[in-house]
C-alpha cells in the first residue's frame, strides 16, 4: 500500500485561496448510514463470491486517491473530494453488482445532498459513477485518482474462496499477487503499479487476460492527470 500524507496530517499544505471541501473523509466515516451501505455492499459481494469490498478496501482507495492528487500538485480541496469519492465508490454494490457505479452515485447523492456543496457533490458523484472500466471514464482529476486507486488494490488477502482458486481465474490471479504498490513520481509525472506475483499460482499472461481493460482505464486516468501510467510485474516493466 502506498502511504504518503493523510488529509489533515503535517505535510499537507492547503492553499488558503482555495476553499476547503464541504465534506471530508472524517464526515463520511462517521456517518452510520454510509457505514451501513459499505458493510451491506460487502455482504452482497461475499454472497456472490466476489473479493472483499468492505471497509479495508474503502479506506485504502480513499487514502490512495488523496495521495495521487496530493503528490501530483492538485489542490487540497480536490484531493479531499477524491478521498471521499474513493471511500464511497462501491456503495452501489449494496443493491446490485450490475451498474453499481451509477447506483452508487445516486445513493451518494441521497446521503450527502443536505451537507455537501453542489459542485463538491457533483464531483464526488461523477467519480463514483465512472470508476468501472465497462461504463466509466476518467472525467476529471478526482475521477482519475479514484480509478487508479481502485484498480491498484489487487491482493491475495482480498480473496474469500481460497479453496476455489484453481477454478476461478479472478481468484487465482488475486491470490497470486503477494504485494501491490502504487508509486507516484511527481517529478517524472508517472504513476506506476508495482506488483509482485507468485508465478507458481498464476502466470503473468493470466493477469493481462482479465485485467487488460483495467490497465487501459488506468492509462487514460493517468493521462487525465497529465501523467503516464506504468505497470511492473516482478520488477519487469510491462506497460
Task: Outline where the language-model segments fall.
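Acidic/His-rich, divalent-metal-binding segments that scaffold phosphate/diphosphate chemistry
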Residues: 2-100, 110-111
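Charged, low-complexity surface segments at secondary-structure and domain boundaries
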Residues: 9, 133, 199-203
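Alpha-helical structural motif
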Residues: 20-21, 30-33, 37, 120, ...
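Divalent metal-dependent catalytic cores for phosphoryl transfer on phosphate-bearing substrates
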Residues: 45-47, 57, 70-184
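Non-transmembrane, amphipathic alpha-helical segments
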Residues: 50-53, 137, 210
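Long, highly charged amphipathic alpha-helices
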Residues: 64, 107, 213-217
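Terminal helices and disordered tails flanking the catalytic cores of nucleotide-processing hydrolases
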Residues: 153-239
Amino acid at each position: 500500500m502506498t502511504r504518503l500524507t493523510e488529509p489533515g496530517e503535517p505535510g499537507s499544505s492547503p492553499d488558503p485561496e482555495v476553499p476547503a471541501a464541504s465534506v471530508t473523509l472524517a464526515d463520511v466515516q462517521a456517518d452510520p448510514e454510509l457505514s451501513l451501505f459499505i458493510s451491506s455492499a460487502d455482504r452482497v459481494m461475499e454472497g456472490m463470491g466476489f473479493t472483499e469490498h468492505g471497509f479495508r478496501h474503502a479506506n485504502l482507495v480513499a487514502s490512495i486517491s488523496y495521495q495521487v492528487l496530493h503528490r501530483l500538485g492538485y489542490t487540497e480541496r480536490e484531493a479531499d473530494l477524491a478521498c471521499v469519492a474513493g471511500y464511497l465508490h462501491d456503495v452501489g454494490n449494496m443493491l446490485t453488482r450490475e451498474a453499481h457505479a451509477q447506483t452508487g452515485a445516486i445513493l451518494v447523492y441521497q446521503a450527502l445532498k443536505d451537507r455537501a456543496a453542489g459542485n463538491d457533490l457533483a464531483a464526488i458523484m461523477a467519480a463514483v459513477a465512472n470508476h468501472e472500466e465497462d461504463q466509466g471514464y476518467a472525467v476529471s482529476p478526482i475521477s482519475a485518482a479514484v480509478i487508479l486507486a481502485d484498480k491498484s488494490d489487487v491482493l491475495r488477502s482480498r480473496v474469500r474462496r481460497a479453496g476455489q482458486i484453481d477454478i476461478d481465474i479472478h481468484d487465482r490471479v488475486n491470490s497470486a499477487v503477494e504485494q501491490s504498490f502504487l508509486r507516484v513520481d511527481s517529478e517524472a509525472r508517472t504513476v506506476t503499479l508495482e506488483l509482485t506475483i507468485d508465478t507458481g499460482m498464476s502466470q503473468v499472461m493470466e493477469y493481462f487476460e482479465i485485467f487488460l481493460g483495467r490497465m487501459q482505464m488506468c492509462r487514460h486516468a493517468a493521462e487525465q492527470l497529465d501523467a503516464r501510467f506504468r505497470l511492473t510485474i516482478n520488477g519487469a516493466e510491462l506497460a
